[in-house]
Amino acid sequence: MAVRIRLKRIGKVKRPFYRIVVADSRTKRDGKVIEQVGKYHPVQNPSFIEIDSPRAQYWLSVGAKPTQQALALLKLTGDWARFCGEENPVSRVEQPVSIEAGKSAPKSCRRSAPVAAGEATPTVSDRPDLPSVSDAPQDVPEDVRGQA
């Protein structure tokens, strides 16, 4: 069974309100859910986001994949960073969660290897095939100058 963390729309016309739910990927958007893990009110200023962090962490750990919208909300609350194993996740809402140090992060959360300290990143001046700014023509015809 493919499980997704996604948004379930409720509310009125032009007054959306979403529940962040865990559901089978084959069910309808507003169909049967396995568990509700949060709420999202996009109309409020500022938007209201509430996620039950321990339950979201559990579902992510057992393989539930968030949709793009749910992933954006998980990143805002810092739950995605906690799942990826970052020590200091950036969050607008502080929710204490303990993560076991022995677990490794899933492949989707791993970052590429950092650049070694001795290696220099290439700059524009290192590339001889690119023309420099000083090689640019200095004189521009008057008929082109007047046009904007």
From Swiss-Prot:
Keywords per UniProt: Ribonucleoprotein, Ribosomal protein
Phosphoprotein as UniProt keyword: no
GO molecular function: structural constituent of ribosome
Record bears the keyword Ligase: no
Signal peptide span: none
Domain of life where this protein originates: Bacteria
Listed GO CC annotations: cytoplasm; small ribosomal subunit
GO BP annotations listed: translation
NCBIfam families: PRK14520.1 (NF011093), S16 (TIGR00002)
Protein name: Small ribosomal subunit protein bS16
Organism (species): Tropheryma whipplei (strain TW08/27)
GN (gene name): rpsP
